[in-house]
Amino acid sequence: MEVPKFLFIAVIVIALSSSLTWAHPMAAPDPNAEAAAGAWAEPAAEPAAEAVAEAAAEAAAEAAAEAVAEAVAEALAEAESEPGLPLLALLMTLPFIQHAITNG
């Protein structure tokens, strides 16, 4: 059974138009919304509290990276007899590597 060309084109047009509605500028949040809120906006956090939170987040990220590296090293050491396990260990670390690259 052959699909009519106009039906194929109609499906593509509908799919593209539905995806474009999500990218419409009116769907984006207003960057000036906080300035317009004025007194209703929350007070900014103190710089010292922000620095402490940032340092804690960096320490947690470093600890997680060290834990992943240690787990990968252990998995590779145990997997010498089974050739598929190093590949599995590598594939399981890809999300962590991507997170570390994209989030600094």
UniProtKB/Swiss-Prot annotation:
GO terms for cellular component: extracellular region. Expressed by the venom gland. Transmembrane segments: none annotated. Belongs to the formicidae venom clade 1 family. The lineage of its organism: Eukaryota, Metazoa, Ecdysozoa, Arthropoda, Hexapoda. Keywords: Amidation, Ion channel impairing toxin, Neurotoxin, Secreted, Signal, Toxin, Voltage-gated sodium channel impairing toxin. The modification Asparagine amide is found at residue 103. Negative results: does not show activity at hNav1.8/SCN10A and hNav1.9/SCN11A when tested at 1 uM. One of its GO terms (molecular function) is sodium channel regulator activity. Residues 24-83 form a propeptide. This is Delta-myrmicitoxin-Mri1a. Vertebrate selective toxin that causes moderate pain by targeting tetrodotoxin (TTX)-sensitive sodium channels in peripheral sensory neurons. Shows moderate and low activities towards hNav1.6/SCN8A (EC(50)=3.3 uM) and hNav1.7/SCN9A (EC(50)>10 uM), respectively. At both hNav1.6/SCN8A and hNav1.7/SCN9A, causes a small sustained current, a reduction in peak current amplitude, and a hyperpolarising shift in the voltage dependence of activation. The small sustained current remains after repolarisation at Nav1.7/SCN9A, but not at Nav1.6/SCN8A. Residues 1-23 form the signal peptide. It is found in: Secreted.
